[in-house]
Amino acid sequence: MSPLLTWNLICVSSRWYTILCLKNKVKFWLGTRLVHEPESMESRSSPYIRPSPYAGGVHPHFEEEDDRSKLHASALYSERRTSSRKSLRSQKIDYHTTTIKSLWFDFCARTSSHGIPYVATSSFFGRYVWAALFMCMLMAFLLQTYWTMSEYLQYRTIIEMQLQFEAAAFPAATVCNLNAFKYSELTQYEEIKEGFDYWERVINARMMSDSMKPGGDILEAISVRKKRSKSRDQLLFPIDDEDLEGAVYQPVFVRCTCMNMEQCVPNRNPLEVNASICMCFEDVTRGLIWPCYPTSVWTVKKCSGCSISNTCPDPDGPNASKQIAKHNSPLPCLCQSISHHCMVHPKDEIRWWNPNNYTVYSVTEPPTTEITETEEAFGLSDLKDAGAITTQTKENLIFLVAALPRETRRNLSYTLNEFVLRCSFNSKDCSMERDFKLHVDPEYGNCYTFNFNDSVELKNSRAGPMYGLRLLLNVHQSDYMPTTEAAGVRLVVHEQDQEPFPDTFGYSAPTGFISSFGLKTKELHRLSAPWGNCSDTFRPVPYIYNEHYSPEGCHRNCFQLKVLEICGCGDPRFPLPSEEHRHCNAKSKIDRQCLSNLTSDSGGYHHLHEQCECRQPCHEKVFETAYSASAWPSQNFKIGTDCPAVSDIFNDTEACTEYYRQNTAYIEIYYEQLNFESLKETAGYTLVNLFSDFGGNIGLWIGFSVITFAEFAELFCEICKLMYFKGIVYVQKKMQGKEYTSSSLMHIDFLQRSPKKSQPGEDEVSTNESTKELMSK
């Protein structure tokens, strides 16, 4: 053999050996992969796989026992968890043989949920125990989910507070005089004057009644009344021993108002009807009259010991025996049995008393003492306390003034120049025409709002009283109404786009003081539905306060509409929605009673929650106020030569100072600090918290995830497809059965009607055989 041939044989042998080695390596690699990756073996080598009893189930199967034992662990894993690799999803489903049960067992074998795969086990005990355990955990999960949803649906909120260090916008400030109207202007209207007269009589009667109680001092009570009456030329009474010195008394008839035998007050109008006739003590030297009693309690007696003032002790009084023994010259006298005071009977007839000209009238029959409808409407007859009487009179005054035209009501109160004497903001002068706006309030008359324009934003350059709003206000106390109990001004701090309500939210500042109001601002940010009920655009229709919406105005609007609906008239304390409506009449008993009943039944305009829909604004500013005061003006402070006191005092500094103390109030409104609090309402339990808790609960109790729900959705779709296909197959079979039956019957009918002749009996046999053949098919 040649060397070349030998070399060629060696090369060929080497190549074959190399190929054989590579082939062995491939076989080894395939065997190793078969052991560690049963899925690959399952999908590529069908001889190694034996189908599972359930759809999609696979079992490894090897020829040799040793190989089966080596792959025992992998076979179990493949049977329990990896059967989904060859499930009904990855195969073409045979809807003729597949059932819902097979789909369910396939789902249990491949689902990612915990516990459900054990429900499909072949063990009877394991199957029902795991099913019961899963149902218990499912109930616990549903209960926990109910609690979680309940927490979310409560829509709880939390408040986040943040302090912002920047200058806040200056608010609007509304100032009013505590005396709403000028008394000198009101008395020009007869109805209003009658209201004051009626209040005067009732107050006098109550004070007289209190003084005549055990322990009461009648002189003290009358002294108080006299001091209140002197400045207005009202009815005067003797008040102390000095006034009684030199007095000469005589009896006079007077038309008066009597609450009972002990309470009679002279009427200022002697011609007034519906008044009683009384007899009073009159001091002819001073024109004073006191006390008065009904004529029924006066009797004519013989008195001894009468003084030069024509007063005598009652002979039937407690000290009658001593007086008679001491004086032996009795005179005819008139005595009353209430306080046992007597007067010498005049020689002439007893005359009528008139506070103006003392005209004598003839005695007539006593007119009726019944309370008129007007007096009953005023509501003073049943009141005993002087404060309650005054408060009710103020309300009556609101009703009386509301009946006047709008322009007339403005003229009854104070103008801007009369009320505001000085004004400065941020150490600069104010512009009266530009910075102030008139606001007419039913209770406080003409009020004036500073910084009313919401398009202009005023800010303080610094904190403190020197850089805020400073106002010097003149209240004109000399022209106060008798029902005004305090002298001063009313202040309301509010947002520019809100209606001021001085009767509810205001602060009072007295005269003779510098009243300092330090402000702190809080910005509120509320959440809208479903966490809250706020709205920045909500407006009830109709709305009596125009565009200035606030919850307080909404409640008043609702109450006013309710009054208009039930009573046919509006409450004079609130505006009317249109000119077509009217305010309730102060003298109408029906109107006043209807309004009173509605207020009592509803509990006031803040309690009509069922009939009213009032929402809080989503963004609101709240101003907290700290009050302090100091005396104004100081002794050495130079007010100036422009003193509005009496003109003949010229440059009398003391007189000007006293005038300012009695009639002016200095107001300071400022920020204590140039920062504000921002209170923001946030959701306490959000949708993110809900999903987080829901995921935790479902993972804790039943071991589900979002993927598990997708698997259930897939199972549901497969069942629906199966049911749909089963229905189609059922309908097709039914239709095919009907067609086959009809064709068979037609064939039988054709055979029966065939014209072919046959021997007797042969036709019947052939027909029966054909029918049996068709039926067997």
Swiss-Prot record:
Keywords, in A-Z order: Glycoprotein, Ion channel, Ion transport, Membrane, Sodium, Sodium channel, Sodium transport, Transmembrane, Transmembrane helix, Transport
Presence of the UniProt keyword Transferase in the record: no
Region (Disordered) residue spans: 752-777
Residues in compartment: Cytoplasmic: 1-128, 711-777
Glycosylation sites (chain numbering): 274, 319, 357, 411, 453, 533, 597
Pfam family, one: ASC
Positions in the Extracellular compartment: 150-689
Biological processes annotated in GO: locomotion; monoatomic cation transport; neuron remodeling; sodium ion transmembrane transport
Residues that span the membrane, as ranges: 129-149, 690-710
Compartment(s): Membrane
A Gene Ontology cellular-component term: neuronal cell body
Membrane topology: Multi-pass membrane protein
PANTHER family per UniProt: AMILORIDE-SENSITIVE SODIUM CHANNEL-RELATED, DEGENERIN UNC-8
Functional summary from the UniProt entry: Sodium permeable non-voltage-sensitive ion channel. Involved in the activity-dependent removal of selected presynaptic proteins, such as synaptobrevin snb-1, and Ras-related rab-3, in the remodeling of GABAergic motor neurons.
Family: Belongs to the amiloride-sensitive sodium channel (TC 1.A.6) family.
Designated name of the protein: Degenerin unc-8
Native source species: Caenorhabditis elegans
